[in-house]
């Protein structure tokens, strides 16, 4: 048999009062593994597709569909439900994506979905939810509490808008690994408006990360002509 090529999709830490561990999610095939200090081997926690992963407040979270799961460490590590979709949120594995983000210590989820405009054309829409861990539910949110969120296909980060003059608060910035970036560079949650970022970089330049998008917006580096296939992974 030939060697299997594994691609790291997400990595995070579990660091609470009872345990410390490293969690790694490999895609294609999807498998979540975990190891604690002193372990001789990785333990398989979950086989299947996870749509987003993030570490927040010493916990490791992931999405199965649009349900938010938490990695629970005990003698047998396992995923437990942290926030369940109330079934009022429609999720399509083919057309939608979900993105967890640690927003200054508060866990949030961005739902990227497809809808139709008045001319029946397909367009992207973005719904944001706070993950209420006490209630175990997703609560609709209309802002990022004054912060800005930079979203890539595999990683999403939150930054303080006031730290950078060129960044708008309560705004979602799309990474160059999303096709709609050419028409929707940034999306304001307050007024639901979108605006194209001044960006001459080619959508065919891969791999591209959310860090690339963040750098462009902060320093105004909208032109990458002359750069040869930048290696800007999300790690």
Residue ranges of model-derived segments:
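A sequence/structural signal of beta-propeller blade repeats
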Residues: 1-119
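C-terminal closing repeat unit and adjoining cap/tail of repeat-based domains
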Residues: 117-235
């Amino acid at each position: 048999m030939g060697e299997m090529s594994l691609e790291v999709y997400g990595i995070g830490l579990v660091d609470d009062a009872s345990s410390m561990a490293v969690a790694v999610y490999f895609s294609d095939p999807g498998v979540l593994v975990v190891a604690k200090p002193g372990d001789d081997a990785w333990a398989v926690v979950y086989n299947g597709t996870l749509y987003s992963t993030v570490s927040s407040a010493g916990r490791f979270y992931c999405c199965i569909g649009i349900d938010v799961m938490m990695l629970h460490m005990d003698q047998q590590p396992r995923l437990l439900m942290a926030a369940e979709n109330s079934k009022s949120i429609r999720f399509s594995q083919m057309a939608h994506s979900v993105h967890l983000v640690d927003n200054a210590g508060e866990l949030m989820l961005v739902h990227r979905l497809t809808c139709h405009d008045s001319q029946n054309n397909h367009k992207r829409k973005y719904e944001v939810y706070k993950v209420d861990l006490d209630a175990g539910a997703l609560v609709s949110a209309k802002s990022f509490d004054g912060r800005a969120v930079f979203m890539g296909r595999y990683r999403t980060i939150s930054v303080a808008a006031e730290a950078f003059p060129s960044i708008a608060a309560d705004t979602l910035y799309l990474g160059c690994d999303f096709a709609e970036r050419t028409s929707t560079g940034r999306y304001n949650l307050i007024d639901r408006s979108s605006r194209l970022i001044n960006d001459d970089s080619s959508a065919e330049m891969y791999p591209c990360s959310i860090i690339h998008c963040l750098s462009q917006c902060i320093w105004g580096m909208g032109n990458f002509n002359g750069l040869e296939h930048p290696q800007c992974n999300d790690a």
